[in-house]
Curated annotation (Swiss-Prot):
Keyword hit for Transmembrane helix: no
Matches recorded under InterPro entries: Hemolysin_N (IPR022220), Hemolysin_N_sf (IPR043080), Leukocidin/Hemolysin_toxin (IPR016183), Ricin_B-like_lectins (IPR035992), Ricin_B_lectin (IPR000772)
UniProt key word Signal: yes
Organism the protein comes from: Aeromonas salmonicida
Record-stated family: Belongs to the HlyA hemolysin family.
GO cellular component: extracellular region
Name of the protein in question: Hemolysin 4
TM spans (from-to): none
Role played: Bacterial hemolysins are exotoxins that attack blood cell membranes and cause cell rupture by mechanisms not clearly defined.
One BP annotation, GO: cytolysis in another organism
Highest classification ranks of the organism: Bacteria, Pseudomonadati, Pseudomonadota, Gammaproteobacteria, Aeromonadales
Residue ranges annotated for the Ricin B-type lectin domain, each copy included: 448-539
Highest rank taxon of the organism: Bacteria
MF term (GO), any: toxin activity
UniProt-listed CDD domains: beta-trefoil_Ricin_hemolysin
Amino acid sequence: MLASLQSEQGLVYLNASSWLDEQQAAKALTRDQLRERVLGQGERIFIDFSGITDKAEPEQARKAMEQLAGISFDADWVLVSAYKGELLFTPLGPPDDPAFYQVMERIDTLAGQGKRHKRSLTQTATAEAGLPRGAFYLKLNRKISVAECTFPRSRTWDRGDRLFCDSPNISLVYRVNLERSLQFGNTGSATPDAKIVRISLDDESAGGGIQLNEDLTWSENIADYLLLDGWARDYATDAIAQDYRFTIDASNTKAAVLKSLPTNLNSKYEHRRISGFEVGVTGGVEVNKDGPKASWRRRPSSASSVTMPTTPRIIGSNARPECPEGEFQLGAGSIRDGGVTALLQDRHRLGNGVRCGSQPHPAAELQGLRAESGCHLQGGADETGSTEFKIDSSVNIRPIYTGIYKHYYVVGGHVSFQGFEDVDKRRRVTASTSFKVDWNHPVFTGGRPVNLQLGGFDNRCLSAGAEHGLSAVTCDETSAAQSFIYDQYGRYVSALDTRRCLDGNNLGQLQSCRLSLGQRWEWKADSDALSNLSAHQLLGHNKQTGELALYDENGNPADVSVRTLTSYTRILRATAGN
């Protein structure tokens, strides 16, 4: 795969086995470095899992990827590139996977990427109080084989088979958002207390979609025997999509369908609708002087609603009204003057003669799939572990068969043109991909990550290490180990492991999160002092060793400082909307 490239083309190779070595893992990419290299510098990261052979090691490596990106894939290779100012993940299959070459050949100007990336890293005051989210794109590419689009040349006679497609393919980009909704209200418009995974089909990908044919061509078959009454001719027109189907399945019961879009799609359906689902909060704090010292609070929001255009030119009359299992289906490709089915089933009297040389129906205007549709899934507020989401994208390929029947009355006659609905002359082709979501990812806490800087040093911050031990290390705003979420209970939850909290009863090691007062903290007004609600003492540290302890506000030894500072870190993005 790599050897086939004419040049490196900005491709960076990353062996996933390096994540298994503790020393190499410490030097690995951070989340922000990944974004900077891909979005800022225009690099493409090729992550290679194929060299990992031990049964336990692949899962360990994928856990490391979840720490890096929030998701992982059951694939030997994953290509990370830029798309619309976000990361695009492309799981790769065999060495000749066309998706690899498609991504490598796509030209994104570095200047355009840098401009989008600069906006993503430089947040406004409103955005800094916005909803933390993990957003990424997932690319799916599959060629439709010759065999899958080969059908009988004639419906009436045995004239062999032919290919009914021209360069057919399934090329889709899915957008995935990971968010947290905190409950606000308990009646009517109340928002859920839940972890949210939003999967939607992107409709702006250049050249993307499900494509069978650019234009429709047809072939004619003529009866090779003397005929008074019967089929005189039939026509076989290139294939169209009878319907498109997208199914999202979860590997366990941790995720339930919250909303599927579209919920209805009729042939005359022309309406832009807003998703009826809202995320329960817009941000961690009000934009005020408290900044990162303010804990996460619930408040209402309507900023995260999703507008779904539901009028692609592929609408038909057979769409499913509801999608309780995370499945939605779009109808047949439309013809200029109405639906395909209605057109072909309409019988046209053509008089006593047979028109030769052309089919007696209008030319078709075809367009590949460009629908923006999706599914919103929710996990419980206390959900842990992980869920693998499998996305099946399929097209029901349908050749168009029509025919001319000669009617004989002894005295005179006529011919009729007829279209056919042969279900057995259709074939569904599916492309699948999957990704795994870690429900313990810090984005699902709903809070903005912050650090705790020790004021007795020039540049030391609190960091979680092996076995959840705490130490003072050089500050790094892109480090997950140095990031904490100051949650609605006043706890400092580790972004490295959201099941662990800073505990005043054991400051040498992070403890399992509870609602005990020993894990609840508040900032003294107009000061850099962090007070423990159980001991009513301040968080302090030894100015030589960095060892943490609780101290009284006054009368402390000279080698102790109770000065603690905090600021936002950059391991998650925060936005005011979508």
